[in-house]
C-alpha cells in the first residue's frame, strides 16, 4: 500500500465519509492482499488478519 500526498492519474480517491485507504491481508500470507479500499475508521488487526491504513484518501 502506497500512501499518496499528490494525486497521480492511477490513484484512487475515496468517497466522502470514508477518507482512509486500507489494505487487508492474512498474517500467514502477508504478500497476498485480501481486500483493499476505503474505510471510515482503520480496523484493528487480529492474529489472523492484518490491516494497513493510510491517513489519507489517496492510495494505489
Curated annotation (Swiss-Prot):
Disulphide linkage map: 3-21, 14-38, 42-53, 54-59
One GO CC term, this protein: extracellular region
Family the entry assigns: Belongs to the three-finger toxin family. Short-chain subfamily. Type IA cytotoxin sub-subfamily.
Subunit structure: Monomer in solution; Homodimer and oligomer in the presence of negatively charged lipids forming a pore with a size ranging between 20 and 30 Angstroms.
ATP-binding found in the keyword field: no
GO molecular function: toxin activity
Chief location category: secreted
Listed GO biological process terms: killing of cells of another organism
Keyword Secreted: yes
Pfam families, sorted: Toxin_cobra-type (PF21947)
Role, per record: Shows cytolytic activity on many different cells by forming pore in lipid membranes. In vivo, increases heart rate or kills the animal by cardiac arrest. In addition, it binds to heparin with high affinity, interacts with Kv channel-interacting protein 1 (KCNIP1) in a calcium-independent manner, and binds to integrin alpha-V/beta-3 (ITGAV/ITGB3) with moderate affinity.
Gene3D superfamilies reported in the protein's UniProt record: CD59 (2.10.60.10)
Organism phylogeny: Eukaryota, Metazoa, Chordata, Craniata, Vertebrata
Compartment list: Secreted; Target cell membrane
Entries under InterPro entries matching the protein: Cytotoxin_Cobra (IPR003572), Snake_3FTx (IPR003571), Snake_toxin-like_sf (IPR045860), Snake_toxin_con_site (IPR018354), Toxin_cobra-type (IPR054131)
Tissue spec. comment: Expressed by the venom gland.
Natural source organism: Naja oxiana (Central Asian cobra)
Protein name in UniProt: Cytotoxin Vc-5
Swiss-Prot/TrEMBL keywords: Cardiotoxin, Cytolysis, Disulfide bond, Membrane, Secreted, Target cell membrane, Target membrane, Toxin
Amino acid at each position: 500500500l502506497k500512501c499518496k500526498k499528490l494525486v497521480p492519474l492511477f490513484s484512487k480517491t475515496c468517497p466522502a465519509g470514508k477518507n482512509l485507504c486500507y489494505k487487508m491481508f492474512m498474517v500467514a500470507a502477508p504478500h497476498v492482499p485480501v481486500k483493499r479500499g476505503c474505510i471510515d475508521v482503520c480496523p484493528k488487526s487480529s492474529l489472523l488478519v492484518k490491516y494497513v491504513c493510510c491517513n489519507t484518501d489517496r492510495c494505489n
